[in-house]
């Protein structure tokens, strides 16, 4: 599966690399699991609704979420910080 970062997700990823290595490792685990099983697995995957219909989220921790969308063989990361 090809990994694509939206601009916001890339900025979030760079932020975590500079500020919290533990969260960076957690994001790596979530991405790896999502490429294998996009709609099940770790981080409590859940489909989003309303304006974000078609996107899914997984818990990075109690405060932050990884928001993503699967399109064919592409994994689009939309957000890696905050709670949508």
Where are these regions (language model features)?
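Enriched for short, Lys/Arg-rich terminal
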Residues: 2, 8-25, 29, 42, ...
């Amino acid at each position: 599966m090809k990994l694509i970062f939206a601009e916001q997700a890339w900025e979030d990823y760079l932020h975590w690399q500079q500020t919290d290595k533990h969260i960076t490792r957690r994001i790596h685990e979530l991405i790896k699991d999502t490429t294998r099983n996009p709609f099940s697995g770790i981080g409590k995957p859940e489909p989003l609704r309303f304006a974000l219909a078609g996107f899914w989220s997984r818990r990075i921790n109690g405060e932050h979420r990884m928001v993503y969308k699967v399109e064919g063989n592409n994994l689009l990361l939309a957000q890696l910080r905050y709670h949508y």
